[in-house]
Amino acid sequence: MKLGLFDHMQKHDNPVRSYVDLYKSHLEVLEFADQAGMDFYFVAEHHFDMGFSECPSPGAFLGAASQRTKNIRLGPLVYVLPLWNPIRVAEEVALLDNLTEGRLECGFGAGIGPFSFAAYNIPWEQKREMTLEALRIIKGIWTHESFTFEGRYFKCKDIDSSIPLVQKPHPPLWMPTRSKNSIEEAASSGISTIQWVPAGMKAARRAFDEYREVYQRTKPSGSKPHIGLMREIFVAESDRQARIDGEFHWKNFWERRGGARTYGAHGSTGLSTILDGSRRQELMDMEHSIAEGSFICGSPETVVGQIKKIANEAGADTFLGEFTFGALTQKQSLNSLRLFAEQVMPELRNFAIDALNFPRAEA
């Protein structure tokens, strides 16, 4: 099983903690993960999402991370493509692929926050079409000596990237998939897919089953993609200690970040667009969230069982854990990650699931 970190880069509403300290602390966690032998580190892109996610430019952070790590594969998850000029993305990814010496993974998506689209004066309703156009341009620039494209939203003429990619034809790609269109695009192109907590395990399994069906039907060329789950995770020496320490931070996470917030004309935050009130209440119940596989929390032995369970339920071959959520201190996050690396990772390394050929769930 492939194992990695996901990072929203939360500031925890701590007015004393500076942004300098925030970014330093996340680089420290990443360095530890690299030394521990984890496979992936992914960072989110969010804008004006105060406290919840403080990395508006994943490429800038990954450039710094590339010089502090040696083996772990690094990537954005995701570049919100409607907010970017695709030519700029193609160039930036090429630069990062060189800075990482071929350790770059690259996630693309349409975004989940209307407020950031309003701030950038980008029509929210057109995000899917814009994403697909941008993706065509980015891949076209990477794979052609000279590329021309004229679409409804983006156009380019005789563009070539002056920076050659280290990985050919391009770095491995990832895409969160919720809609039928995104599932079709990802699976038919051999792009890895990922699901987070809000959808729930049943929805994740349905999306993965549809992805597998399209992948088997279209049989895209290239290396095999991954099917992954991302979860907040807290590991402690015992189940009791994990629940005592983890409950406050889990509830803090959903109380402060799971509801609708508005920024004047910029509209509501992303989570409020995919979470209704009843689902939010379910997630705020820590025991319910642990039982349904939305929150990974416990001793190392318990966590091994929890991850195996959700991987088997969804047919996933990759697990990404967010170790820095809620108001966890740096010491708590690093201790949780240390226990994971020392006692959980060895048990999961030989746990294998053939995710692309996993049997479809019974109706």
Name what the model sees in each region.
Residues 1-68, 72-73, 168-171, 358-363:
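N-terminal beta1-alpha1-beta2 module of alpha/beta enzyme domains
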Residues 3, 45, 65, 96, ...:
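Conserved, mostly hydrophobic/aromatic
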Residues 3-7, 41-43, 74-76, 104-108, ...:
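Hydrophobic faces of well-ordered beta-strands that scaffold small-molecule active sites
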Residues 7, 125-161, 202-316, 345, ...:
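An alpha-helical appendage that flanks or caps ligand/catalytic pockets
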Residues 11-23, 79-87, 167-177, 291-300:
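Active-site mouth loops of central-metabolism enzymes
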Residues 34-35, 62-70, 93, 97-104, ...:
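Acidic (Asp/Glu)-rich catalytic clusters
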Residues 40-61, 80, 112, 198-199, ...:
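Glycine-rich, proline-tolerant flexible connector loops at the mouths of alpha/beta enzymes
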Residues 82-191, 201-209, 213-219, 359-363:
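Internal, glycine-rich beta/alpha segment that forms the wall or movable "lid"
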